């Protein structure tokens, strides 16, 4: 059986990870998750993509919202609102317990990897979810007027300001998770997550970037674009604002130095020749995942 490493963001990546979890032995699956979205809020360390993956794989996610836990209550947030506290980032009561426990574990001296694995055990999951790095890397969104932290852009401002660039802070002190030996994986999968803010933070980490470049024949990309639109999140909007065509060809060009195989949706079959010309082995299937 092959060993797979998934490079994963939030909702779209989590759906693919769930498919792998349900299809192969957990011993053959590792999921490295973007932590560029992580931030400290109300004194708590919050890891949105790690939590989305963990909740999804534990069948605990709120599928109607695409984030948070199912059967959630909001007593803390309601009480905080009455105190005129910060409520722009919505924390449900059960979700809050995750952030409290993570923060406690990290403050007790655990690495983010160890804290993540402790949380996985609480959700009866194998220890196959890893943060991309144990060092902090923070994604910022450059707009025309100012630089925004990712959560300020994504949640507080609802992705409204036009994007001009991306900035990743902390790269001088960070690298890909040292607990993951890239040479042990037969295939690396780039999940259908936002290439700019979910996958690109990982590609900035030298250990991973160099490995993908040298072993691109072992790397498969799953397109997050289907029929000229993104199924989740602001990927298509960002492409347009950056002056890029919203297409699988743009995705292929973005990953061209790191991947030699790509899966595209059957609605994009007309793009196959252009992807072949870029050097890709193209696979066509139905990419929309319902879970």
Where on the chain are the PLM-derived regions?
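Active-site glycine-rich loop that binds ribose-phosphate moieties when present
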Residues: 164-182
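Redox- and metal-dependent alpha/beta enzyme cores, enriched for Fe-S-associated oxidoreductases
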Residues: 203-242
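A short helix->loop->beta-strand "cap" motif at the edges of active sites that frequently abuts
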Residues: 25-27, 214-219, 280
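Extreme N-terminal starter segment of soluble prokaryotic enzymes
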Residues: 1-5
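Short Gly/Thr/Asp-enriched flexible loops that form oxyanion-binding sites at enzyme active sites
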Residues: 17-21, 198-211
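Short internal beta-strands
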Residues: 30-34, 217-225, 261-266
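C-terminal functional extensions of proteins
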Residues: 232-291
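Electropositive, gly/pro-rich neighborhoods at or near active sites that engage anionic ligands
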Residues: 33-170
């Amino acid at each position: 059986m092959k060993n797979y490493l998934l490079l994963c963001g939030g909702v779209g990546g989590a759906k693919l990870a769930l498919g792998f979890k349900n299809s192969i032995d957990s011993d053959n699956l590792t999921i490295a998750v973007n932590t560029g979205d992580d931030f400290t809020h109300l004194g708590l360390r919050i890891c949105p993509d790690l939590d989305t993956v963990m909740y999804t794989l534990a069948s605990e996610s709120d599928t109607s919202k695409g984030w948070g836990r199912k059967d959630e209550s909001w007593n803390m947030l309601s009480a905080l609102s009455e105190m005129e506290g910060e409520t722009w980032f919505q924390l449900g009561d059960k979700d809050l317990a995750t952030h409290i426990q993570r923060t406690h574990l990290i403050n007790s001296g655990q690495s983010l990897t160890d804290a993540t694995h402790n949380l996985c055990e609480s959700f009866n999951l194998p220890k196959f979810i890893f943060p991309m790095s144990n060092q902090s890397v923070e994604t910022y969104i450059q707009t025309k007027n100012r630089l925004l932290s990712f959560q300020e852009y994504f949640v507080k401002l609802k992705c409204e300001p036009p994007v001009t660039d991306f900035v990743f802070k902390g790269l001088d002190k960070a690298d890909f998770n040292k607990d993951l030996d890239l040479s042990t994986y037969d295939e690396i999968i780039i999940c259908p997550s936002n290439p700019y803010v979910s996958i690109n933070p990982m590609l900035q980490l030298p250990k991973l970037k160099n490995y993908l470049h040298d072993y691109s024949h072992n790397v498969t990309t799953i397109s997050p674009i289907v029929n000229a639109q993104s199924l989740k999140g602001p990927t298509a909007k960002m492409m347009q604002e950056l002056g890029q065509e919203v297409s699988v060809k743009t995705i292929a060009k973005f990953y061209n130095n790191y991947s030699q195989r790509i899966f595209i949706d059957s609605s994009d079959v007309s793009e196959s020749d252009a992807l072949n010309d870029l050097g890709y082995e193209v696979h066509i299937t139905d990419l929309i995942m319902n879970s």
